Every structure is written in C-alpha cells, then in structure tokens.
Amino acid sequence: MASNRIELFKQMLSSDPGNTTVMFGLAKEYEKSGQDSELIETLNRYIEASDDEGNAFGMLASAYERIGQRDQAKAAYQRGVETAQRHGHPGHRRQPRQGDL
C-alpha cells in the first residue's frame, strides 16, 4: 500500500519537480515505510526548495540518527532550531538533549 502512495507521489513530482508540497508528502511516505536513505535525500531537496519552518529538520535529524549519522543529526537539529526561531516558533527552540543524539 505504501509503495503505491510512494509511486503516486513520485509521478506527481516528475510532472512538477519543484512542488514542495508533493516533496514533503513523498518524504512522509518514506518515513512511514522506513526508507531512511530516500527520506534523507527527499528532505534535503525539500529544504533547499522550500521555506520550511522547522518541522522537516526534525524529521531529517531523526532519519540521520536511525542510520547512525550522529553529526548530521546534530547539525539538522541545530538548523531546525535556528529556522524555528526565525519563524517565531518558541516551541521548537529547545536544544536537543544529550540523550537525543
């Protein structure tokens, strides 16, 4: 079932490669199906193309953590905190705890 949704998002993205809503939807499907490498690649493209307010960075950091790339996870968390602050989201200002990484 998830693979059908992934294929649908990929088809939509192929006809509109800059559609950040579709990119984020594809990333969520990769996250649900545990495809961390694809998730990381898609989120990095999404972050470059969008004005994300911080949520994608948390997803990205979690994916990096799952594959053991702690330095990249820490950097993604930090970028997420900085981005959330720029957008005025105080709930996202928390620095990751030591155990988070």
Walk through the language-model features, giving the residues of each:
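Conserved structural position within tetratricopeptide repeats
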Residues: 11-14, 44-48, 82
